[in-house]
């Protein structure tokens, strides 16, 4: 089922015109060197950065959504955001609960998401007292809550700009599990990141960007090829098969 359509979308000189489409249940990864345009693309998909062309979410152009309607359809995690110091975690999360959601269902969702992200003991803590990794997980919990299927049946899309930043190995695994669960509910996720092996293992589709252009897009195995990646990143990559999985390495000098 079609979820998102991009028709000749561009953002000034920061993102060249391209077209694409996203169906339901997919995890799509945006990869490319720093400055490639990944954050620009995500912000435009979120409706927060004006773009030329047309972005259609759930059959309706982003330009025709009211703010409160768009907030029910998608959630967006920016790459950086300062913590609001005079606020405990539980109050911050409450700002993201969908309008009209059942209070008990919201409490259950908060408990579930925070347990998965290992945040339960942080709920009463002030945001200013969180470490960088804790704050990142709180931000993730908030955007998950905004579009969590049990309390927001209208939700369609989660947009995450470098969500794994600041997370340790166990926390990354926990985030992976939540993303898989979210996609299995018929929603889709678009993620930017720099861990090529993580993308190789987790993504259903990959969009490869460089210098403000979407150069290649398609199924993961089609895009994550050593020759394609080497040309874009200007690094000599190799792909190895080990234990029934593929792994990307750089070639030794």
Curated annotation (Swiss-Prot):
Record GO terms (molecular function): ABC-type vitamin B12 transporter activity; ATP binding; ATP hydrolysis activity; ATPase-coupled transmembrane transporter activity
Annotated binding of ATP, by residue: 32-39
Every ABC transporter domain range: 4-236
Compartments, as annotated in UniProt: Cell inner membrane
Keywords on record: ATP-binding, Cell inner membrane, Cell membrane, Membrane, Nucleotide-binding, Translocase, Transport
Reaction(s) catalysed by this chain's protein: an R-cob(III)alamin(out) + ATP + H2O = an R-cob(III)alamin(in) + ADP + phosphate + H(+)
Recorded GO CC terms: ATP-binding cassette (ABC) transporter complex
EC number: 7.6.2.8
Classification via InterPro entries: AAA+_ATPase, ABC_transporter-like_ATP-bd, ABC_transporter-like_CS, ABC_transptr_BtuD, Metal_Ion_Import_ABC, P-loop_NTPase
Primary location: membrane
Membrane topology designation: Peripheral membrane protein
PROSITE patterns hit by this protein: ABC_TRANSPORTER_1, ABC_TRANSPORTER_2
Subunit structure as annotated in this protein's UniProt entry: The complex is composed of two ATP-binding proteins (BtuD), two transmembrane proteins (BtuC) and a solute-binding protein (BtuF).
NCBIfam families: PRK03695.1 (NF002981)
Recorded family membership: Belongs to the ABC transporter superfamily. Vitamin B12 importer (TC 3.A.1.13.1) family.
Annotated function: Part of the ABC transporter complex BtuCDF involved in vitamin B12 import. Responsible for energy coupling to the transport system.
Name used for this protein in its record: Vitamin B12 import ATP-binding protein BtuD
Species this chain originates from: Yersinia pestis
């Amino acid at each position: 089922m079609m979820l998102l359509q991009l028709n000749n979308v561009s953002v000034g000189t920061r993102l060249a015109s391209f077209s694409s489409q996203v169906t339901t249940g997919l995890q799509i990864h945006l990869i490319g060197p720093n400055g490639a345009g990944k954050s620009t693309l995500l912000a435009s998909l979120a409706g927060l950065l004006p773009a030329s062309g047309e972005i259609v979410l759930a059959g309706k152009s982003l330009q025709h959504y009211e703010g409160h309607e768009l907030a029910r359809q998608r959630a967006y995690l920016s790459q950086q955001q300062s913590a609001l110091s005079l606020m405990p975690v539980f109050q911050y999360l409450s700002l993201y609960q969908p309008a009209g959601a059942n209070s008990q269902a919201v409490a259950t969702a908060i408990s579930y998401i925070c347990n998965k992200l290992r945040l339960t003991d942080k709920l009463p803590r002030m945001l200013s007292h969180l470490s960088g990794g804790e704050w990142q997980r709180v931000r993730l919990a908030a955007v998950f809550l905004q579009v969590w299927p049990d309390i927001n049946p209208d939700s369609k899309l989660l947009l995450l700009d470098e969500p794994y930043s600041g997370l340790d190995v166990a926390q990354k695994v926990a985030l992976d599990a939540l993303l898989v669960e979210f996609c299995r509910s018929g929603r889709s996720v678009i993620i930017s990141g720099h861990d090529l092996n993580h993308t190789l293992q987790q993504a259903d589709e990959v969009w490869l960007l460089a210098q403000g252009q979407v150069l290649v897009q398609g199924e993961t195995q089609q895009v994550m090829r050593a020759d394609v990646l080497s040309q874009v990143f200007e690094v000599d990559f190799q792909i190895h098969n080990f234990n029934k999985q593929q792994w990307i390495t750089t070639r030794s000098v």
